[in-house]
A protein has these predicted regions:
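Ligand-recognition surfaces built from glycine- and aromatic
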Residues: 29-38, 217-262
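Extracellular beta-strand elements of beta-rich domains used
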Residues: 46, 192, 235-237
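Extracellular glycan-recognition surfaces and repeat-rich motifs
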Residues: 56-88, 94-97, 253
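Secretory/extracellular carbohydrate-interaction modules
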Residues: 90-164
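Short tryptophan-centered beta-strand motifs in secreted/extracellular beta-sheet-rich domains
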Residues: 113-115, 185-195, 199-203
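Short, aromatic/His-centered strand-loop micro-motif at the edge of beta-sheets
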Residues: 165-189
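Short, solvent-exposed beta-strand-to-loop segments that form ligand-recognition rims
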Residues: 202-223
Length: 262
């Protein structure tokens, strides 16, 4: 496609090229269903190690702009991060029993959160779950999470009333999910859409949707997480605008989710 576009551009007059160039080089993006992409809020290529925020956070969820993560191997519950093969590489500590996490602080409301990821083919070394996740937080805790593993993906809401006694954080509502057949070492694109009280999560052509009042709260950060070992690149965040086709898309997604349960 790129070679074809280049040959076509060489044959065009400069004046015509000026008007057609935006269309010839238009970026191909994964489809959205709940929303339409609006203003771009953040673009993080993640090909070099991001600078760490100097802000003092309010817990883990808010009070900072930019990135928070650890680069120290076996540093505890947050795991460790570096750049490997041109991507942001997260490693769960074998003794931590907790995903590696990296948070990007920015204020947002309705949004499209998109990131490429790869589950790396490394030994488990006692770690249990090969997975990645994308979470959205409000001022104090998680609002929603998109979990992805080799055999399935699910979308989770968090309770506004119940607290998990083990971690003192909001308890999870029952997840909604679909089976997947992902491969180690392959790159995929995860898309999490949030608008009002609804959310849609999509990977490898399969989507899930759910709703919860907490989704409508102002958001303060995006968290990336890794079970075992995974890499990320090209984190993009846009405003999530209303999609007039959402009722039709919702019906199709719910039907596919129902069919997947059979």
């Amino acid at each position: 496609m790129a070679a074809c576009s280049l040959n076509l551009m060489k044959s065009l007059s400069p004046a015509l090229l000026f008007f057609l160039a935006p269309f010839l080089w238009a970026e191909e993006l994964p489809p959205t269903f709940l929303t339409l992409r609006g203003k771009e809020l953040a673009r993080q290529d993640l090909t070099t190690l991001p600078a760490l925020s100097a802000d003092k956070p309010k817990g883990f969820a808010s009070g900072f702009a930019g990135w928070r993560f650890s680069t120290v191997a076996n540093s505890g519950r947050s795991g460790s991060w570096n750049i490997a093969e041109g991507a942001f590489h997260g490693m769960e500590g074998p003794a931590a029993n907790h995903p590696a996490t990296a948070s990007f602080g920015l204020p947002y409301q309705d949004a499209v959160i998109q990131v490429e990821f790869r589950l790396n083919d490394v030994p488990l070394e006692g770690r249990k779950y090969r997975s990645v996740f994308v979470k959205a937080t409000d001022e104090k805790d998680y609002v929603t999470a998109f979990f992805i593993g080799l055999a399935g993906s699910n979308l989770v809401a968090y309770s506004a009333e119940r607290i998990n006694p083990a971690n003192k954080q909001r308890d999870k509502e029952p997840p909604v999910g679909v089976p997947q057949s992902l491969k180690l070492g392959a790159w995929y694109v995860a898309v999490l859409e949030i608008r009002g009280q609804e959310a849609v999560a999509t990977v490898a052509g399969k989507s899930t949707t759910t709703s919860h009042p907490l989704f409508a709260k102002p958001k303060q950060s995006v968290m990336l997480g890794v079970g075992v070992d995974a890499s990320f690149r090209n984190l993009r965040i846009w405003e999530g605008m209303a999609n007039p086709e959402w009722p039709k898309h919702k019906e199709a997604i719910l039907a596919a989710m129902k069919s997947a349960k059979k």
